[in-house]
Protein backbone atom coordinates (compact mmCIF):
# COMPACT_ATOMS: atom_id res chain seq x y z
CA UNK A 1 0.00 0.00 0.00
CA UNK A 2 1.25 3.49 -0.77
CA UNK A 3 0.13 7.09 -1.14
CA UNK A 4 1.01 8.48 -4.54
CA UNK A 5 -0.05 10.00 -7.81
CA UNK A 6 -2.59 8.27 -10.00
CA UNK A 7 -2.70 9.51 -13.61
CA UNK A 8 -5.40 8.75 -16.20
CA UNK A 9 -4.51 5.92 -18.57
CA UNK A 10 -5.77 7.65 -21.71
CA UNK A 11 -5.57 11.45 -21.25
CA UNK A 12 -6.91 13.67 -24.06
CA UNK A 13 -4.42 14.16 -26.87
CA UNK A 14 -2.11 17.14 -26.35
CA UNK A 15 -3.23 17.73 -22.76
CA UNK A 16 -0.88 17.19 -19.82
CA UNK A 17 -2.69 15.76 -16.80
CA UNK A 18 -1.01 15.95 -13.40
CA UNK A 19 -3.14 13.27 -11.78
CA UNK A 20 -4.52 12.99 -8.27
CA UNK A 21 -2.85 12.08 -5.01
CA UNK A 22 -4.52 8.98 -3.63
CA UNK A 23 -4.04 5.81 -1.59
CA UNK A 24 -2.99 2.98 -3.89
CA UNK A 25 -2.45 -0.66 -3.10
CA UNK A 26 -2.82 -4.35 -3.84
CA UNK A 27 -4.18 -7.22 -1.78
CA UNK A 28 -3.65 -10.92 -2.34
CA UNK A 29 -4.77 -13.75 -0.09
CA UNK A 30 -5.76 -17.39 -0.16
CA UNK A 31 -6.93 -20.00 2.29
CA UNK A 32 -8.19 -23.53 2.67
CA UNK A 33 -10.35 -25.16 5.34
CA UNK A 34 -10.57 -28.97 5.43
CA UNK A 35 -13.76 -29.78 7.34
CA UNK A 36 -13.81 -33.54 6.77
CA UNK A 37 -11.72 -35.96 4.69
CA UNK A 38 -14.12 -35.20 1.79
CA UNK A 39 -15.38 -31.63 2.32
CA UNK A 40 -13.26 -28.49 2.01
CA UNK A 41 -13.58 -24.78 1.24
CA UNK A 42 -10.88 -22.90 -0.65
CA UNK A 43 -10.68 -19.27 -1.59
CA UNK A 44 -8.32 -16.75 -3.12
CA UNK A 45 -8.55 -13.07 -3.92
CA UNK A 46 -6.49 -10.54 -5.85
CA UNK A 47 -7.57 -6.90 -5.81
CA UNK A 48 -5.91 -3.62 -6.70
CA UNK A 49 -7.01 -0.01 -6.43
CA UNK A 50 -6.33 0.87 -10.08
CA UNK A 51 -5.21 -0.51 -13.42
CA UNK A 52 -1.50 0.42 -13.31
CA UNK A 53 -0.43 -0.07 -9.68
CA UNK A 54 0.94 -3.60 -10.24
CA UNK A 55 3.03 -2.55 -13.23
CA UNK A 56 4.16 0.71 -11.63
CA UNK A 57 5.71 -1.11 -8.67
CA UNK A 58 6.76 -4.24 -10.57
CA UNK A 59 4.50 -6.57 -8.58
CA UNK A 60 2.90 -8.36 -11.52
CA UNK A 61 2.31 -8.07 -15.28
CA UNK A 62 -1.07 -9.81 -15.15
CA UNK A 63 -3.86 -7.98 -16.96
CA UNK A 64 -6.67 -9.80 -15.16
CA UNK A 65 -7.04 -10.47 -11.42
CA UNK A 66 -9.32 -13.32 -10.37
CA UNK A 67 -11.01 -13.89 -7.03
CA UNK A 68 -12.83 -17.11 -6.21
CA UNK A 69 -14.37 -19.16 -3.44
CA UNK A 70 -15.14 -22.86 -3.82
CA UNK A 71 -16.81 -25.43 -1.59
CA UNK A 72 -16.18 -28.95 -2.82
CA UNK A 73 -16.58 -32.58 -1.92
CA UNK A 74 -14.17 -35.14 -3.39
CA UNK A 75 -15.18 -38.78 -3.13
CA UNK A 76 -13.72 -41.96 -4.54
CA UNK A 77 -16.03 -41.87 -7.58
CA UNK A 78 -17.74 -38.49 -7.29
CA UNK A 79 -17.03 -34.79 -7.23
CA UNK A 80 -19.24 -31.85 -6.19
CA UNK A 81 -18.42 -28.15 -6.30
CA UNK A 82 -20.18 -24.83 -5.69
CA UNK A 83 -18.00 -21.89 -6.67
CA UNK A 84 -18.09 -18.20 -7.46
CA UNK A 85 -15.72 -16.14 -9.60
CA UNK A 86 -15.08 -12.42 -10.05
CA UNK A 87 -12.61 -10.76 -12.43
CA UNK A 88 -10.92 -7.37 -12.26
CA UNK A 89 -9.76 -6.46 -15.78
CA UNK A 90 -6.72 -4.16 -15.87
CA UNK A 91 -6.51 -3.74 -19.65
CA UNK A 92 -6.63 -0.20 -21.02
CA UNK A 93 -9.57 -0.99 -23.32
CA UNK A 94 -11.61 -2.91 -20.73
CA UNK A 95 -15.18 -1.89 -19.89
CA UNK A 96 -15.86 -2.55 -16.21
CA UNK A 97 -19.57 -3.05 -16.84
CA UNK A 98 -18.83 -5.89 -19.26
CA UNK A 99 -16.76 -7.90 -16.77
CA UNK A 100 -18.52 -11.14 -15.76
CA UNK A 101 -19.31 -12.38 -12.28
CA UNK A 102 -19.82 -16.16 -12.26
CA UNK A 103 -22.20 -17.01 -9.44
CA UNK A 104 -23.05 -19.72 -8.79
CA UNK A 105 -20.95 -22.24 -10.71
CA UNK A 106 -22.17 -25.72 -9.74
CA UNK A 107 -20.60 -28.94 -10.95
CA UNK A 108 -21.36 -32.55 -10.01
CA UNK A 109 -19.65 -35.62 -11.49
CA UNK A 110 -20.08 -39.31 -10.85
CA UNK A 111 -18.32 -42.23 -12.54
CA UNK A 112 -19.02 -45.94 -12.47
CA UNK A 113 -18.24 -49.11 -14.40
CA UNK A 114 -20.75 -50.06 -17.08
CA UNK A 115 -21.89 -53.64 -16.26
CA UNK A 116 -23.11 -54.93 -19.66
CA UNK A 117 -20.47 -54.29 -22.34
CA UNK A 118 -17.78 -52.90 -20.06
CA UNK A 119 -16.19 -49.49 -20.05
CA UNK A 120 -16.59 -46.49 -17.81
CA UNK A 121 -19.51 -44.04 -17.57
CA UNK A 122 -19.07 -40.43 -16.45
CA UNK A 123 -22.18 -38.47 -15.48
CA UNK A 124 -22.06 -34.69 -15.12
CA UNK A 125 -24.54 -32.04 -13.98
CA UNK A 126 -23.44 -28.44 -14.41
CA UNK A 127 -24.97 -24.99 -14.06
CA UNK A 128 -23.53 -21.50 -14.36
CA UNK A 129 -24.85 -17.98 -13.89
CA UNK A 130 -23.03 -15.08 -15.58
CA UNK A 131 -23.93 -11.59 -14.33
CA UNK A 132 -22.76 -8.21 -15.66
CA UNK A 133 -23.58 -4.78 -14.29
CA UNK A 134 -23.83 -3.33 -17.80
CA UNK A 135 -23.95 -6.20 -20.27
CA UNK A 136 -25.41 -9.54 -21.25
CA UNK A 137 -26.53 -11.92 -18.50
CA UNK A 138 -26.52 -15.66 -19.17
CA UNK A 139 -27.65 -18.72 -17.23
CA UNK A 140 -26.73 -22.22 -18.38
CA UNK A 141 -27.42 -25.76 -17.19
CA UNK A 142 -26.67 -29.13 -18.75
CA UNK A 143 -26.65 -32.84 -18.01
CA UNK A 144 -24.31 -35.23 -19.81
CA UNK A 145 -23.34 -38.89 -19.88
CA UNK A 146 -20.10 -40.08 -21.48
CA UNK A 147 -19.13 -43.72 -22.00
CA UNK A 148 -15.53 -44.80 -22.67
CA UNK A 149 -14.24 -48.27 -23.46
CA UNK A 150 -10.53 -48.97 -23.89
CA UNK A 151 -9.20 -52.28 -25.18
CA UNK A 152 -5.85 -53.62 -26.40
CA UNK A 153 -6.08 -55.94 -29.40
CA UNK A 154 -4.02 -59.05 -29.95
CA UNK A 155 -1.74 -57.10 -32.30
CA UNK A 156 -1.10 -54.40 -29.70
CA UNK A 157 -3.38 -51.61 -30.92
CA UNK A 158 -4.94 -49.42 -28.21
CA UNK A 159 -8.57 -48.86 -29.22
CA UNK A 160 -10.80 -46.38 -27.36
CA UNK A 161 -14.53 -46.04 -28.09
CA UNK A 162 -16.45 -43.00 -26.83
CA UNK A 163 -20.13 -42.04 -26.83
CA UNK A 164 -21.49 -38.76 -25.46
CA UNK A 165 -25.05 -37.52 -24.89
CA UNK A 166 -25.76 -34.06 -23.48
CA UNK A 167 -28.74 -31.77 -23.04
CA UNK A 168 -28.34 -27.99 -22.58
CA UNK A 169 -30.70 -25.25 -21.40
CA UNK A 170 -29.80 -21.55 -21.76
CA UNK A 171 -31.42 -18.28 -20.77
CA UNK A 172 -30.00 -14.88 -21.63
CA UNK A 173 -31.05 -11.24 -21.84
CA UNK A 174 -29.56 -7.92 -22.95
CA UNK A 175 -27.80 -9.86 -25.72
CA UNK A 176 -27.36 -6.76 -27.89
CA UNK A 177 -24.84 -5.40 -25.35
CA UNK A 178 -22.32 -8.01 -26.52
CA UNK A 179 -20.28 -6.35 -29.27
CA UNK A 180 -19.30 -9.49 -31.22
CA UNK A 181 -22.48 -10.75 -32.88
CA UNK A 182 -21.56 -14.46 -33.05
CA UNK A 183 -21.14 -14.53 -29.25
CA UNK A 184 -24.62 -13.20 -28.40
CA UNK A 185 -26.94 -16.11 -29.12
CA UNK A 186 -30.70 -15.62 -29.11
CA UNK A 187 -32.33 -13.98 -26.10
CA UNK A 188 -34.73 -15.85 -23.87
CA UNK A 189 -34.80 -19.62 -23.45
CA UNK A 190 -32.84 -21.85 -25.83
CA UNK A 191 -32.36 -25.61 -25.73
CA UNK A 192 -29.80 -27.85 -27.41
CA UNK A 193 -29.14 -31.59 -27.62
CA UNK A 194 -25.67 -32.96 -28.35
CA UNK A 195 -24.65 -36.46 -29.37
CA UNK A 196 -21.18 -37.62 -30.39
CA UNK A 197 -19.40 -40.91 -31.03
CA UNK A 198 -15.69 -41.48 -31.56
CA UNK A 199 -13.24 -44.29 -32.24
CA UNK A 200 -9.56 -43.75 -31.51
CA UNK A 201 -6.74 -46.17 -32.35
CA UNK A 202 -3.10 -45.87 -31.33
CA UNK A 203 -0.54 -48.51 -32.37
CA UNK A 204 2.70 -48.23 -30.36
CA UNK A 205 5.87 -49.93 -31.60
CA UNK A 206 8.55 -50.27 -28.92
CA UNK A 207 12.15 -51.38 -29.37
CA UNK A 208 15.78 -50.76 -28.52
CA UNK A 209 17.64 -47.88 -30.17
CA UNK A 210 20.78 -45.84 -29.50
CA UNK A 211 21.42 -47.65 -26.24
CA UNK A 212 17.93 -46.96 -24.93
CA UNK A 213 14.23 -47.51 -25.66
CA UNK A 214 12.26 -45.82 -28.43
CA UNK A 215 8.52 -45.80 -29.12
CA UNK A 216 6.74 -44.93 -32.37
CA UNK A 217 2.94 -44.59 -32.11
CA UNK A 218 0.82 -43.87 -35.21
CA UNK A 219 -2.66 -42.67 -34.28
CA UNK A 220 -5.99 -42.20 -36.08
CA UNK A 221 -9.37 -41.02 -34.78
CA UNK A 222 -12.88 -40.77 -36.23
CA UNK A 223 -15.47 -38.45 -34.63
CA UNK A 224 -19.11 -37.97 -35.71
CA UNK A 225 -21.60 -35.42 -34.35
CA UNK A 226 -25.01 -34.47 -35.85
CA UNK A 227 -25.54 -30.84 -36.94
CA UNK A 228 -25.98 -28.45 -34.01
CA UNK A 229 -27.57 -25.01 -33.63
CA UNK A 230 -24.49 -23.55 -31.97
CA UNK A 231 -25.19 -19.91 -32.82
CA UNK A 232 -28.58 -20.00 -31.08
CA UNK A 233 -26.97 -20.16 -27.63
CA UNK A 234 -24.63 -17.54 -26.10
CA UNK A 235 -20.89 -18.10 -26.18
CA UNK A 236 -19.31 -17.23 -22.83
CA UNK A 237 -16.52 -19.80 -22.42
CA UNK A 238 -15.64 -21.04 -25.94
CA UNK A 239 -14.15 -17.90 -27.45
CA UNK A 240 -10.40 -18.36 -27.21
CA UNK A 241 -9.77 -20.97 -29.92
CA UNK A 242 -6.21 -22.23 -30.32
CA UNK A 243 -5.45 -25.37 -32.31
CA UNK A 244 -2.45 -27.17 -30.81
CA UNK A 245 -1.12 -30.65 -30.21
CA UNK A 246 -2.91 -30.82 -26.85
CA UNK A 247 -6.43 -30.63 -28.37
CA UNK A 248 -6.07 -31.89 -31.96
CA UNK A 249 -7.46 -35.30 -30.86
CA UNK A 250 -10.07 -33.90 -28.44
CA UNK A 251 -13.72 -34.88 -28.81
CA UNK A 252 -14.58 -31.16 -28.90
CA UNK A 253 -11.84 -28.78 -30.00
CA UNK A 254 -13.68 -25.72 -28.75
CA UNK A 255 -12.68 -24.76 -25.20
CA UNK A 256 -15.45 -24.69 -22.60
CA UNK A 257 -19.02 -25.91 -23.06
CA UNK A 258 -20.88 -23.24 -25.07
CA UNK A 259 -19.69 -24.38 -28.49
CA UNK A 260 -19.45 -27.99 -29.66
CA UNK A 261 -17.86 -29.07 -32.94
CA UNK A 262 -20.32 -30.91 -35.20
CA UNK A 263 -19.89 -32.91 -38.41
CA UNK A 264 -17.70 -35.91 -39.22
CA UNK A 265 -13.91 -35.70 -39.16
CA UNK A 266 -10.87 -37.93 -39.19
CA UNK A 267 -7.73 -36.97 -37.29
CA UNK A 268 -4.38 -38.61 -37.89
CA UNK A 269 -0.87 -38.21 -36.57
CA UNK A 270 1.76 -39.87 -34.48
CA UNK A 271 4.03 -39.71 -31.45
CA UNK A 272 7.70 -40.52 -30.96
CA UNK A 273 9.65 -41.07 -27.74
CA UNK A 274 13.27 -41.96 -27.03
CA UNK A 275 14.76 -42.61 -23.60
CA UNK A 276 18.49 -43.15 -23.16
CA UNK A 277 20.59 -42.53 -20.05
CA UNK A 278 20.16 -38.83 -19.08
CA UNK A 279 18.53 -37.97 -22.44
CA UNK A 280 14.81 -37.88 -23.23
CA UNK A 281 13.15 -36.94 -26.54
CA UNK A 282 9.42 -36.51 -27.18
CA UNK A 283 7.66 -35.48 -30.41
CA UNK A 284 4.08 -35.44 -31.70
CA UNK A 285 2.32 -34.24 -34.85
CA UNK A 286 -1.29 -34.24 -36.07
CA UNK A 287 -3.80 -32.99 -38.63
CA UNK A 288 -7.52 -33.46 -39.23
CA UNK A 289 -9.87 -33.60 -42.23
CA UNK A 290 -13.59 -32.85 -42.13
CA UNK A 291 -15.68 -35.24 -44.20
CA UNK A 292 -18.66 -32.90 -43.86
CA UNK A 293 -19.04 -30.17 -46.50
CA UNK A 294 -21.05 -27.92 -44.19
CA UNK A 295 -19.19 -24.63 -43.46
CA UNK A 296 -17.32 -24.80 -40.19
CA UNK A 297 -18.07 -22.62 -37.19
CA UNK A 298 -14.37 -21.98 -36.57
CA UNK A 299 -13.22 -18.53 -37.76
CA UNK A 300 -10.54 -18.21 -40.43
CA UNK A 301 -7.08 -18.06 -38.93
CA UNK A 302 -7.73 -20.55 -36.13
CA UNK A 303 -6.30 -23.44 -38.17
CA UNK A 304 -9.71 -25.15 -38.34
CA UNK A 305 -11.52 -22.94 -40.84
CA UNK A 306 -11.12 -25.33 -43.81
CA UNK A 307 -11.78 -29.03 -44.32
CA UNK A 308 -8.08 -29.79 -43.84
CA UNK A 309 -6.80 -28.37 -40.58
CA UNK A 310 -3.38 -26.86 -40.10
CA UNK A 311 -0.60 -29.19 -38.94
CA UNK A 312 0.28 -28.94 -35.26
CA UNK A 313 3.04 -30.55 -33.26
CA UNK A 314 5.41 -30.42 -30.35
CA UNK A 315 9.05 -31.39 -29.78
CA UNK A 316 10.71 -31.69 -26.38
CA UNK A 317 14.28 -32.62 -25.44
CA UNK A 318 15.73 -32.96 -21.93
CA UNK A 319 19.25 -33.76 -20.83
CA UNK A 320 19.11 -34.65 -17.14
CA UNK A 321 18.09 -31.61 -15.11
CA UNK A 322 20.63 -29.41 -16.86
CA UNK A 323 19.07 -28.69 -20.26
CA UNK A 324 15.57 -28.56 -21.71
CA UNK A 325 14.19 -27.47 -25.08
CA UNK A 326 10.51 -27.28 -26.03
CA UNK A 327 9.10 -26.28 -29.42
CA UNK A 328 5.37 -26.00 -30.16
CA UNK A 329 4.35 -25.21 -33.74
CA UNK A 330 1.47 -24.85 -36.17
CA UNK A 331 2.03 -25.01 -39.93
CA UNK A 332 -0.31 -23.77 -42.64
CA UNK A 333 -2.00 -26.69 -44.41
CA UNK A 334 -1.43 -25.20 -47.90
CA UNK A 335 2.16 -23.95 -47.94
CA UNK A 336 3.62 -24.98 -44.55
CA UNK A 337 3.96 -21.33 -43.48
CA UNK A 338 4.65 -21.07 -39.76
CA UNK A 339 1.42 -19.86 -38.14
CA UNK A 340 2.63 -20.40 -34.60
CA UNK A 341 6.11 -21.01 -33.24
CA UNK A 342 6.86 -21.13 -29.53
CA UNK A 343 10.34 -22.08 -28.32
CA UNK A 344 11.54 -22.33 -24.72
CA UNK A 345 15.17 -23.17 -23.92
CA UNK A 346 16.69 -23.47 -20.45
CA UNK A 347 20.16 -24.51 -19.32
CA UNK A 348 21.72 -24.63 -15.88
CA UNK A 349 20.92 -25.61 -12.31
CA UNK A 350 18.29 -24.39 -9.86
CA UNK A 351 20.48 -21.49 -8.70
CA UNK A 352 22.48 -20.65 -11.85
CA UNK A 353 20.65 -20.79 -15.15
CA UNK A 354 19.81 -19.08 -18.43
CA UNK A 355 16.46 -19.08 -20.22
CA UNK A 356 15.55 -18.00 -23.74
CA UNK A 357 12.05 -17.83 -25.19
CA UNK A 358 10.64 -16.99 -28.61
CA UNK A 359 7.02 -16.60 -29.72
CA UNK A 360 5.64 -15.93 -33.19
CA UNK A 361 1.91 -15.82 -33.95
CA UNK A 362 0.92 -15.36 -37.60
CA UNK A 363 -2.71 -16.47 -37.49
CA UNK A 364 -4.47 -13.73 -39.49
CA UNK A 365 -7.56 -13.87 -37.28
CA UNK A 366 -10.01 -11.08 -38.09
CA UNK A 367 -10.21 -8.45 -35.37
CA UNK A 368 -14.03 -8.44 -35.33
CA UNK A 369 -14.08 -12.02 -34.01
CA UNK A 370 -11.50 -12.18 -31.24
CA UNK A 371 -8.64 -10.08 -29.91
CA UNK A 372 -5.96 -12.62 -30.88
CA UNK A 373 -3.58 -10.28 -32.67
CA UNK A 374 -0.48 -11.52 -34.45
CA UNK A 375 2.80 -10.76 -32.71
CA UNK A 376 6.43 -11.80 -32.43
CA UNK A 377 8.45 -11.62 -29.23
CA UNK A 378 11.79 -12.74 -27.79
CA UNK A 379 12.73 -12.90 -24.11
CA UNK A 380 15.81 -13.88 -22.16
CA UNK A 381 16.70 -14.24 -18.49
CA UNK A 382 19.82 -15.24 -16.58
CA UNK A 383 20.66 -15.76 -12.90
CA UNK A 384 24.12 -16.47 -11.49
CA UNK A 385 24.64 -17.61 -7.90
CA UNK A 386 27.43 -15.95 -5.92
CA UNK A 387 27.96 -18.18 -2.94
CA UNK A 388 25.11 -19.88 -1.05
CA UNK A 389 22.91 -16.79 -0.56
CA UNK A 390 23.72 -14.07 -3.10
CA UNK A 391 22.90 -13.94 -6.81
CA UNK A 392 22.84 -11.49 -9.71
CA UNK A 393 20.12 -11.60 -12.35
CA UNK A 394 18.96 -9.91 -15.52
CA UNK A 395 16.26 -10.21 -18.16
CA UNK A 396 15.01 -8.58 -21.36
CA UNK A 397 11.87 -8.65 -23.51
CA UNK A 398 11.96 -7.48 -27.14
CA UNK A 399 8.98 -6.91 -29.44
CA UNK A 400 9.82 -8.26 -32.91
CA UNK A 401 6.38 -7.56 -34.40
CA UNK A 402 6.35 -5.59 -37.64
CA UNK A 403 3.47 -3.82 -39.36
CA UNK A 404 3.52 -6.55 -42.00
CA UNK A 405 2.51 -9.03 -39.31
CA UNK A 406 0.12 -6.69 -37.47
CA UNK A 407 -1.04 -3.49 -39.24
CA UNK A 408 -2.06 -2.03 -35.85
CA UNK A 409 1.41 -2.48 -34.36
CA UNK A 410 3.66 0.55 -33.82
CA UNK A 411 6.79 -1.60 -33.61
CA UNK A 412 9.48 -1.40 -36.30
CA UNK A 413 10.41 -5.07 -35.92
CA UNK A 414 12.87 -4.68 -33.03
CA UNK A 415 11.57 -2.66 -30.09
CA UNK A 416 12.76 -3.38 -26.54
CA UNK A 417 9.84 -3.69 -24.14
CA UNK A 418 11.57 -4.10 -20.79
CA UNK A 419 15.06 -4.78 -19.41
CA UNK A 420 16.06 -5.61 -15.87
CA UNK A 421 19.26 -6.05 -13.85
CA UNK A 422 19.62 -6.73 -10.14
CA UNK A 423 21.25 -8.41 -7.17
CA UNK A 424 19.49 -10.44 -4.49
CA UNK A 425 19.97 -12.25 -1.19
CA UNK A 426 17.93 -15.20 0.09
CA UNK A 427 18.22 -17.46 3.13
CA UNK A 428 15.75 -19.43 5.27
CA UNK A 429 14.06 -16.36 6.77
CA UNK A 430 15.01 -13.27 4.78
CA UNK A 431 14.89 -12.10 1.17
CA UNK A 432 15.97 -8.74 -0.18
CA UNK A 433 17.19 -7.36 -3.46
CA UNK A 434 17.95 -4.27 -5.50
CA UNK A 435 16.72 -4.03 -9.10
CA UNK A 436 17.15 -1.56 -11.94
CA UNK A 437 14.40 -1.76 -14.55
CA UNK A 438 13.88 0.16 -17.76
CA UNK A 439 10.46 0.25 -19.43
CA UNK A 440 10.02 1.43 -23.00
CA UNK A 441 6.21 1.87 -23.05
CA UNK A 442 3.80 4.14 -21.17
CA UNK A 443 0.65 2.83 -19.47
CA UNK A 444 -0.85 5.59 -17.35
CA UNK A 445 1.55 6.36 -14.52
CA UNK A 446 3.59 3.24 -15.33
CA UNK A 447 5.84 5.52 -17.37
CA UNK A 448 8.70 4.66 -19.66
CA UNK A 449 12.16 5.21 -18.23
CA UNK A 450 14.31 3.93 -15.39
CA UNK A 451 12.97 2.52 -12.13
CA UNK A 452 14.98 1.48 -9.09
CA UNK A 453 13.38 -1.00 -6.69
CA UNK A 454 14.44 -2.23 -3.26
CA UNK A 455 12.53 -5.24 -1.95
CA UNK A 456 12.54 -6.89 1.51
CA UNK A 457 10.53 -9.98 2.51
CA UNK A 458 10.42 -11.98 5.75
CA UNK A 459 9.72 -15.66 5.06
CA UNK A 460 8.77 -18.71 7.15
CA UNK A 461 7.32 -16.58 9.94
CA UNK A 462 5.63 -18.72 12.59
CA UNK A 463 7.16 -21.98 11.40
What are these regions (language model features)?
Residues 1-463:
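Outer-membrane beta-barrel proteins and related beta-barrel translocases across Gram-negative bacteria
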Amino acid sequence: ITYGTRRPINPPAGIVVDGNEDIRGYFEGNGRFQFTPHWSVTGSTRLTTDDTFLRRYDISRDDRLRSTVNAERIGEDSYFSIAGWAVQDLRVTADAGQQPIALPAIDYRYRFDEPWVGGRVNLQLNSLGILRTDGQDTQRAFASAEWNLRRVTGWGQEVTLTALARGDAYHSDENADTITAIYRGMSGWQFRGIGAIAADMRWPFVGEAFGGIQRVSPRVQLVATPPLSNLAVPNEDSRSIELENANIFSLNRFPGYDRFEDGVRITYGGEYALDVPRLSLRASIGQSYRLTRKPTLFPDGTGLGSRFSDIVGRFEARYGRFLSLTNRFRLDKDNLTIRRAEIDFAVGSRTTYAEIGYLRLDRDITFNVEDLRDREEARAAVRVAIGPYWSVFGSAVVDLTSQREDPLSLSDGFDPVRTRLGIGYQDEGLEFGFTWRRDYDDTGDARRGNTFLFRVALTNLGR
